[in-house]
């Protein structure tokens, strides 16, 4: 069940308002289905202005929306789990507290999108464009980020555990306090990226480029960095490693004196800013 509107209302179960809402929703379904089908025509006839008006809520499980043009659309508390949006144009879109678990967004264009507090567990972003996205507190657990462009992305406090990010681009990205544990980042580029307080424990980093990256307070304890590129002793001196850290020849890690970082994500209860996180960050001293 899916609907588009400028306002999302959740009446109490069994109330007259709820009954009217169901009737209204049933009546709008047919017209909205036609609206989605005509998305290409909107893009051709009216440019992006019509798509900008769309706000999506409700459920659209396993929907087929590949190739759609929905720039700057808003997804607020929406459930698009399993949806197929291959190659769709979603640049500048806003995702607040929405569920895209297992969705297929391969080759989609999401550059400049906002992904606050949304769930992209096991989502396929293969070769997608996520450059410049704001993904504070977003959950990418197990996502496929193979050859994905995340240059300049702000992923502060995001969950990237067990992702497949081989050959991905994180150039100039902010990954402050992010969890990258057990992820596959072979041949990925973190050039000039901010990895302050990030956790790389158990990550696969063969051929990964860290040239100019900020590794202050980054957890590299037990991490194998022997095949990583661009590392300097100055970077390693700022990171949190130890005897179990494996480094390229000539580099030596030091043991942390305290915890690395705690990033507490508090989600707003405001309907307008639903899913938009605030952060309290406590950095330990290595």
What do the PLM-derived regions correspond to, one by one?
Residues 1-20:
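N-terminal secretory signal peptides that target proteins for export/translocation
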Residues 2-3, 36, 231, 269:
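A composition/secondary-structure signal for short, hydrophobic, low-basic-content segments
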């Amino acid at each position: 069940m899916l609907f588009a509107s400028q306002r999302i209302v959740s009446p109490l179960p069994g109330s007259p308002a709820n009954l009217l809402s169901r009737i209204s929703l049933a009546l709008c379904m047919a017209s909205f289905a036609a609206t989605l089908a005509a998305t290409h025509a909107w893009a051709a006839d009216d440019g992006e202005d019509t798509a900008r008006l769309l706000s999506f809520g409700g459920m659209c499980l396993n929907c087929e929306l590949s190739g759609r043009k929905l720039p700057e659309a808003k997804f607020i508390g929406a459930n698009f789990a399993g949806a197929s949006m291959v190659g769709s144009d979603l640049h500048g879109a806003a995702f607040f507290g929405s569920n895209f678990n297992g969705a297929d967004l391969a080759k989609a264009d999401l550059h400049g999108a906002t992904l606050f507090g949304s769930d992209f567990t096991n989502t396929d972003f293969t070769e997608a464009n996520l450059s410049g996205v704001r993904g504070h507190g977003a959950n990418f657990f197990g996502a496929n980020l193979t050859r994905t462009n995340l240059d300049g992305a702000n992923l502060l406090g995001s969950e990237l555990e067990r992702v497949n990010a081989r050959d991905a681009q994180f150039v100039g990205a902010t990954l402050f306090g992010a969890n990258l544990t057990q992820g596959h980042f072979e041949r990925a580029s973190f050039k000039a990226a901010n990895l302050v307080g990030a956790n790389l424990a158990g990550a696969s980093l063969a051929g990964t480029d860290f040239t100019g990256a900020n590794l202050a307070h980054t957890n590299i304890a037990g991490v194998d960095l022997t095949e990583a590129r661009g590392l300097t002793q100055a970077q390693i001196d700022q990171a949190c490693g130890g005897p179990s850290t494996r480094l390229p020849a000539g580099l030596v890690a030091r043991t942390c004196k305290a915890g690395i970082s705690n990033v507490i994500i508090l989600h707003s209860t405001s309907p307008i800013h639903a899913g938009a996180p605030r952060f309290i960050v406590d950095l330990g001293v290595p």
